[in-house]
Amino acid sequence: MKLSKDTTALLKNFATINSGIMLKSGQFIMTRAVNGTTYAEANISDVIDFDVAIYDLNGFLGILSLVNDDAEISQSEDGNIKIADARSTIFWPAADPSTVVAPNKPIPFPVASAVTEIKAEDLQQLLRVSRGLQIDTIAITVKEGKIVINGFNKVEDSALTRVKYSLTLGDYDGENTFNFIINMANMKMQPGNYKLLLWAKGKQGAAKFEGEHANYVVALEADSTHDF
């Protein structure tokens, strides 16, 4: 099999969520954070030929970048990963699947309680402003008929009362109120446009970012509130 630049870019992104990955035969990849706060999945154009666990995904991708784009990836007789181009061959150790935290199957997302969108340029601004202003927490809430993201520094403002950044996403025609809290450390998605689905029931809640190339599900923080 061969991995295109688009697939390797996705895998590099997934490595920011979990340093290891379990690749399974087919055209679907997925991962989740060790603490379970973030899940990501994607359909890819390449076909994965065999099941294999990779403990150090960034290390594997780094080695893969050193060979030609036409390098062939296969499974060696001893179960490890063989990377070969016209002149060189590299053997990368496969991991014991039990050492890699990975989802057993795709995680279904419930029917959304609220839906909006976040544009690529807005997501990029949010991430950049958050770094510049030390914003570690965002709250997705309703204000005057609009769905709004507010940014806070929870370390210095544990009650989240001092807004450091605000971004209006779109109109909200529902009657419910909510204040969904997300840790910025879990915002690992690739740059792009996303449909944002918000769900909550009781003390549980999650936000799903549906993109052109990948989907991400992020758990809401325990101090989130809603009346759904």
From Swiss-Prot:
Please tell me whether the keyword DNA repair is annotated for this protein: no
A Pfam family cross-referenced in the UniProt record is DNA_PPF
Q: Does the keyword DNA damage apply?
A: no
State the Gene Ontology BP annotations: bidirectional double-stranded viral DNA replication; DNA replication; viral DNA genome replication; viral transcription
Which UniProt keyword terms apply here?
DNA replication, Viral DNA replication, Viral transcription
One of the entry's Gene Ontology molecular-function terms is:
DNA polymerase processivity factor activity
Q: How does it assemble?
A: Homotrimer. Interacts with the viral DNA polymerase; this interaction constitutes the polymerase holoenzyme. Interacts with the sliding-clamp-loader; this interaction allows the sliding-clamp-loader to open the sliding clamp. Interacts with the viral DNA ligase. Part of the replicase complex that includes the DNA polymerase, the polymerase clamp, the clamp loader complex, the single-stranded DNA binding protein, the primase, the helicase and the helicase assembly factor. Interacts with the viral RNA polymerase (RNAP).
Xref: HAMAP family: Sliding_clamp_T4 (MF_04161)
Query: What family is this protein classified in?
Result: Belongs to the Tevenvirinae sliding clamp family.
What job does this protein perform? Sliding clamp that encircles the genomic DNA and links the DNA polymerase to the template to control the processivity of DNA synthesis. Responsible for tethering the catalytic subunit of DNA polymerase to DNA during high-speed replication. Interaction with the sliding-clamp-loader opens the sliding clamp so that it can be loaded around the DNA template. During transcription, encircles the DNA and tethers host RNA polymerase (RNAP) to it.
Q: What is this protein called?
A: Sliding clamp
**Lineage, uppermost ranks:** Viruses, Duplodnaviria, Heunggongvirae, Uroviricota, Caudoviricetes
Annotated gene: 45
